[in-house]
Amino acid sequence: MKIKNYQPVGVQEERKTIHNLPRNHFVCIIHSSKGTGKTNTVINLIKDYDKTKFFQKVYLFSPSYEADPKYQHLNDGNYDLRVYNDFTNDIFQEVMEDIQADLDEWNHYLYRVKLYEKLQKAKSLKQFTQHDLFQLDEMAYDKPIAPFPCEPFSLICFDDLASNKQLMSQGKSLVNSVLLRCRHFRTSFIYVVQQYRNAVPKMVRANTDLFILAISKSRKDMEAVGEELTSYASLNDIVSMWEKATAEPFSYFVINLMSPNANLRFTRNFDEPLNAV
């Protein structure tokens, strides 16, 4: 018997991306010490995704946003940018309600599309329920207009918030519960941190699909990351590839666990394959 790979109803196919970027919803950790270009990396990542109009909304939580003029480069994207100078559970709840409202609006549009298609084939209005007829009347019996160019995908980025206890809770938290269901919300997450194990909750680390790692002078920090990825490569190989990838200025070691090509799982800056020495 041939086993089919069924996908959730209503979910679009993977979207186009450039380089070796994940083509679906992801959780990303950008780990970089001070002065190694974290902000620059975030901007490049978001802009590369924007080249294919991947995200419709970007929510940036960053207390240093106004003090860092580089972030102004994000203002000219094809997405709707929302910026927050702090993180609280209440603010995050509002963000998730906004995301859910967009998805509900999109799903209602899809329902109306099917209703309109049924109308084109129908021989009588008796085939429709009262609710359907009410919807058709609101549509003026015309083809519905899409509220967005495509199903709304969102990105939530947390930058410079390692000390925020509501966000970085090691136990149950609002963010952690949402992150586990990020694909249902069509939402990706980016955590930008200077420390790894002591800052990022274990649950987040265990569900990360994409690691972007800058040069590190601490083998201890490198091993802290590598020890959690030994099912993909040995600890020594991960450290060796990390050192090789970041030997040149502004180069990053990228671990993309979502890559459909195993040869591009470990790369320098997404598109230069690395092999364990």
Label every PLM stretch briefly.
Residues E14-K16, F26-D48, P63-Y65, Y111-D237:
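Conserved P-loop NTPase motor cores
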Residues L60, F158, I255-N256:
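Hydrophobic side chains in beta-strands
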Residues D98-A101, M222-N261:
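P-loop/Walker A phosphate-binding loop and immediately adjacent motor/lid segment at beta-alpha junctions
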Residues H73-Y79, G226-S231, F270-E272:
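Generic alpha-helical propensity signal that fires on short helical segments
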Residues G35-K123:
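Conserved P-loop
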Residues M1-C28, L119, L125, Q130, ...:
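Conserved P-loop NTPase motor module
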Residues T52-F55, F148-E151, A247:
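Short helix-terminating capping/connector loops at secondary-structure junctions
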Residues Y59, S188-I190, F253:
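A structural signal for isolated positions on well-ordered beta-strands in alpha/beta enzyme cores
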